[in-house]
Curated annotation (Swiss-Prot):
Signal peptide (UniProt feature, chain positions): 1-18
GO cellular component: longitudinal sarcoplasmic reticulum; sarcoplasmic reticulum membrane
Organs and tissues of expression: Expressed in skeletal muscle and cardiac muscle. Also expressed in liver, kidney, adipocytes and skin.
Name under which the protein is recorded: Dehydrogenase/reductase SDR family member 7C
Swiss-Prot/TrEMBL catalytic activity: all-trans-retinol + NAD(+) = all-trans-retinal + NADH + H(+)
One MF term in the entry's GO annotations: all-trans-retinol dehydrogenase (NAD+) activity
């Protein structure tokens, strides 16, 4: 019996691996069929996450509209996508210059997209601008710039494209947000405020457009790290507050977020949080034990201000 168990273990592991492989392949093919021939608009397509979303959706056969502030960056992304794609299974992406912080140009860009394809099936609001610093040292001009890029830009583009989706009674709007839409982190007042605002808008919009079969989805990771980012090493392990902040800052890779965006589109999920247990616990504590949460965060700020810089 012991020998039989030893022999069965490798076979069991092999069988599980085979089933996982089949599931992943089936999921990949299913994802492709969900976006094939669909007109997909991706904002800030030249960012790390934007590039990965473009890669995933282009491979799935979507008719991409890639928006970005830098034309050279868009052309570089275009060259990368077309160099590895099968022309018989993919469509040539359309490139559009778009700076969401410049609200005046958003309507013209949306009109250009609709004139080209006649519709938009999926809108991925990915653009985001960050700023970090004490609230009293952040100028109102910078506060407004953050709100334009993170709030007014996405909702303006959404409002212009939404009537087309409503009239066709189909479409999906995906907001790539941040877990800071659920609770604020010190020294990120403008960024957190913009994320709270845009989450509130799309939460309300979701209920408004459900009767038209338009899906509104939000994907909120803790932090989208760069390809070269690595966790910062500090002697904070003994502090609960700083342990929380360190865990929160690890974030997720753009590839992971792009794959989750694709799954969200395929399954028409309404809300997704991409976070390890510590940030999820923070959301829970903030909701049910707010006074304790505020005390812990304030304690963390005091400790951070009292820790001398290294080097």
């Amino acid at each position: 019996m012991g020998l039989m168990a030893v022999l069965m273990l490798p076979l069991l592991l092999l069988g599980i691996s085979g089933l996982l492989f089949i599931y992943q392949e089936a999921s990949r093919l299913w994802s492709k069929s969900a976006v094939q021939n669909k007109v997909v608009v991706i904002t800030d397509a030249i960012s790390g996450l934007g590039k990965e979303c473009a890669r995933v959706f282009h491979a799935g056969g979507a008719r991409l509209v890639l928006c970005g502030k830098n034309w050279e960056g868009l052309e570089s992304l275009y060259a990368t996508l077309t160099s590895v794609a099968d022309p018989s299974k993919t469509f040539t992406p359309k490139l559009v210059l778009l700076d969401l912080s410049d609200i005046s140009c958003v309507q013209d860009v949306a009109k250009e997209v609709l004139d080209c394809y006649g519709c938009v099936d999926i809108l991925i609001n990915n653009a985001s601008v960050k700023v970090k610093g004490p609230a009293h040292k952040i100028s109102l001009e910078l506060d407004k710039k953050i709100m334009d890029a993170n709030y007014f830009g996405p909702i303006t583009l959404t409002k212009v494209l939404l009537p087309n989706m409503i009239s066709r009674r189909t479409g999906q709007i995906v907001l790539v947000n941040n877990i800071q839409a659920k609770f604020g982190i010190p020294f990120r007042t403008a960024y957190a405020a913009s994320k709270h605002a845009v989450m509130g808008f799309f939460d309300c919009l979701r209920a408004e457009v459900e009767e038209y079969d338009v899906v509104v989805s939000t994907v909120s990771p803790t932090f989208i790290r760069s390809y070269r980012a690595s966790p910062e090493q500090r002697n904070w392990e003994t502090s609960i507050c700083k342990f929380f902040c360190r865990k929160l800052a690890y974030g997720v890779h753009p590839v992971e977020v792009a794959e989750e965006v694709m799954r969200t589109v395929r399954r028409k999920k309404q809300e997704v949080f991409m976070a390890n247990p510590v940030p999820k616990a923070a959301v829970f504590i903030r909701t049910f034990f707010p006074e304790f949460f505020f005390a812990v965060v304030a304690c963390g700020v005091k400790e951070k201000l009292n820790v001398p810089e290294e080097g």
